[in-house]
C-alpha cells in the first residue's frame, strides 16, 4: 500500500451518454496523496459491485457478524430501470457514501480494492468526439451540495472559452494550452483555477488565460461589495504590480470584490489592492485544506502579466481601477461611520451631561436645635409629662 492513498473524493455530477446505448455515469474528482486531481467516470452498477466486494473483504466492519459493529456505509441496490430522475436522486447518497469511505480506518480507506477502483482507466480518458451523433449531456452538482429531483430542468451546457496565449502546465494535474484552443469549462474554482476539458485532455487551467467567445467581459463576475467580508491571509505575498497589496501571513482583511480570475480586491484599513484568493481563508475556518491547494497549484498568473496575449475581441475587458475601488471604499466607510456611531455618541453625551448631577452631593437639611425641658413639658402629652417627672 505504501504512501499511495486517496485524500478526498468529490462527486461532480453525472453524464447522460448515448453510446453504445443510453446510460448514466457519475463523475468523481479524486484527490491523491501527491495532491494530483483526476476525474473518473463510473456507472452505478459498477459502484454497487465495488461496494459488495468491499463488504465481503471486511465482514466485521460490514456488520455481517454483528450489525452493531457496522461502519461501512449502506448503498441501495440498482433498479431494473435507471432513469434521469433516479440518477439525480442518487447524488446525495453517493456524496455521503464517498465521504464516509474516506473517514473509515486506514485498512479500509487505503485498501488496494478501493484505490484500484478510483484509479484512472483508459475509458476515463476517452472523451466524446465531434463525429458522434449525440454528445453526452452533463448535469453538475449544485455548489451547496443539495439536489432535488424536482429541480431538473435539463442538461447543463458546459461553457466554452478560448485560450488567449500559450500556457505550459506546471504539474500533472494541469492542462497545457495553445493560443486559440477552445475548451469546455467543467468547474470554475474561486482560486482562479478552472477545470477544463478539450478533446482527449482534462486538467486545471488559469482562468486568466481564457476568454468567453461572445464578449471580452466575464458575465459571471459579481458586483463589488464594499461592506466587505472578513478573511485571514494564510500565506504572505509581496506585491509585484502597483495595484497589488503586500501582506504577511495571519493578517485580517476585508474582501470587497471577488473576481473569477482568482485575484480579489481586498481592503486593509483604508488601503485597497489585488491579492491572490488562494492565499485567503474565511475568518474562523480551518486553513489546512486551503494550504494544501497552495502546495498543489499556487496562485494563478494575472492577465496583465501574460505575454503575447491575443484576444478575438476588439475592445478589452472592463475593469475598475484601484482609484475607483479606493474612492468608493472610503465613501462607504465614511457613511458607515456616520450611520452607526451616532446613536451611541448621543447616548454617551447624555450620560456625560447627567453624570455630574448624579455625582454632586445633595444638600442636607439643617438639624433643628434640641428643645428645652420647659418647652417639652409645655407641649407634650400628659403621658410624656408623667414619664419625664418620674425620670427626674
From Swiss-Prot:
GO terms for molecular function: phosphatidylinositol binding; phosphatidylinositol-3,4-bisphosphate binding; superoxide-generating NADPH oxidase activator activity. One of its GO terms (biological process) is superoxide anion generation. Residues 4-125 form the PX domain. Residues 290-392 are annotated as: Disordered. Phosphorylated by PRKCD; phosphorylation induces activation of NCF1, leading to assembly and activation of the NADPH oxidase complex. SUPFAM superfamilies: PX domain, SH3-domain. It is found in: Cytoplasm, Cytosol; Membrane. Component of the phagocyte NADPH oxidase complex composed of an obligatory core heterodimer formed by the membrane proteins CYBA and CYBB and the cytosolic regulatory subunits NCF1/p47-phox, NCF2/p67-phox, NCF4/p40-phox and the small GTPase RAC1 or RAC2. Part of a cytosolic complex composed at least by NCF1, NCF2 and NCF4. Interacts (via C-terminus) with NCF2 (via the C-terminal SH3 domain). Interacts with NCF4. Interacts with CYBB. Interacts (via the second SH3 domain) with CYBA; interaction is phosphorylation-dependent. Interacts with NOXA1. Interacts with ADAM15. Interacts with TRAF4. The PX domain mediates interaction with phosphatidylinositol 3,4-bisphosphate and other anionic phospholipids. In the autoinhibited, unphosphorylated state an intramolecular interaction with the C-terminal SH3 domain precludes phospholipid binding and interaction with CYBA. Phosphorylation disrupts the autoinhibited state. PANTHER family: NEUTROPHIL CYTOSOL FACTOR 1-RELATED (PTHR15706:SF6), SH3 MULTIPLE DOMAIN (PTHR15706). This is Neutrophil cytosol factor 1. The lineage of its organism: Eukaryota, Metazoa, Chordata, Craniata, Vertebrata.
Amino acid at each position: 500500500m505504501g504512501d499511495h492513498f486517496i485524500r478526498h473524493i468529490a462527486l461532480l455530477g453525472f453524464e447522460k451518454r448515448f453510446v453504445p446505448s443510453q446510460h448514466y455515469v457519475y463523475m468523481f474528482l479524486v484527490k491523491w496523496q501527491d495532491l494530483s486531481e483526476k476525474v473518473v467516470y463510473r456507472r452505478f452498477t459498477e459502484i454497487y459491485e465495488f461496494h459488495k466486494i468491499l463488504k465481503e473483504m471486511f465482514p466485521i466492519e460490514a456488520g455481517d457478524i454483528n450489525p452493531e459493529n457496522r461502519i461501512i456505509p449502506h448503498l441501495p441496490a440498482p433498479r431494473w430501470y435507471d432513469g434521469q430522475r433516479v440518477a439525480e436522486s442518487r447524488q446525495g447518497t453517493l456524496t455521503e457514501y464517498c465521504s464516509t469511505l474516506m473517514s473509515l480506518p486506514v485498512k479500509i480507506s487505503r485498501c488496494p480494492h478501493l484505490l484500484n477502483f478510483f484509479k484512472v482507466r483508459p475509458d476515463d480518458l476517452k472523451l466524446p468526439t465531434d463525429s458522434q451523433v449525440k454528445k453526452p449531456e452533463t448535469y453538475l452538482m449544485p455548489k451547496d451540495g443539495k439536489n432535488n429531483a424536482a429541480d431538473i430542468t435539463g442538461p447543463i451546457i458546459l461553457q466554452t472559452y478560448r485560450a488567449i496565449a500559450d500556457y505550459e502546465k506546471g504539474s500533472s494535474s494541469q492542462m497545457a494550452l495553445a493560443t486559440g484552443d477552445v475548451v469546455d469549462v467543467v468547474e470554475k474554482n474561486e482560486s482562479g483555477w478552472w477545470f477544463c476539458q478539450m478533446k482527449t485532455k482534462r486538467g486545471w487551467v488559469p482562468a486568466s488565460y481564457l476568454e468567453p467567445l461572445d464578449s471580452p467581459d466575464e458575465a459571471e463576475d459579481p458586483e463589488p461589495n464594499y461592506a466587505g467580508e472578513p478573511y485571514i491571509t494564510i500565506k504572505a505575498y509581496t506585491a509585484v504590480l502597483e495595484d497589488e497589496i503586500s501582506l504577511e501571513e495571519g493578517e485580517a482583511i476585508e474582501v470587497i470584490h471577488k473576481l473569477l480570475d482568482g485575484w480579489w480586491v481586498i481592503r486593509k484599513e483604508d488601503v485597497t489592492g489585488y491579492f491572490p484568493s488562494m492565499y485567503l481563508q474565511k475568518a474562523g475556518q480551518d486553513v489546512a485544506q486551503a494550504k494544501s491547494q497552495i502546495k498543489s497549484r499556487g496562485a494563478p498568473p494575472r492577465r496583465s502579466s501574460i505575454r503575447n496575449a491575443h484576444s478575438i475581441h476588439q475592445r478589452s475587458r472592463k475593469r475598475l481601477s484601484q482609484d475607483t475601488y479606493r474612492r468608493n471604499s472610503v465613501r462607504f466607510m465614511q457613511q458607515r461611520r456616520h450611520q452607526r456611531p451616532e446613536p451611541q455618541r448621543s447616548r454617551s453625551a447624555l450620560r456625560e451631561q447627567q453624570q455630574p448631577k448624579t455625582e454632586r452631593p445633595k444638600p442636607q437639611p439643617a438639624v433643628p436645635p434640641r428643645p428645652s425641658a420647659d418647652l417639652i413639658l409645655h407641649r407634650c402629652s400628659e403621658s410624656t409629662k408623667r414619664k419625664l417627672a418620674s425620670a427626674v
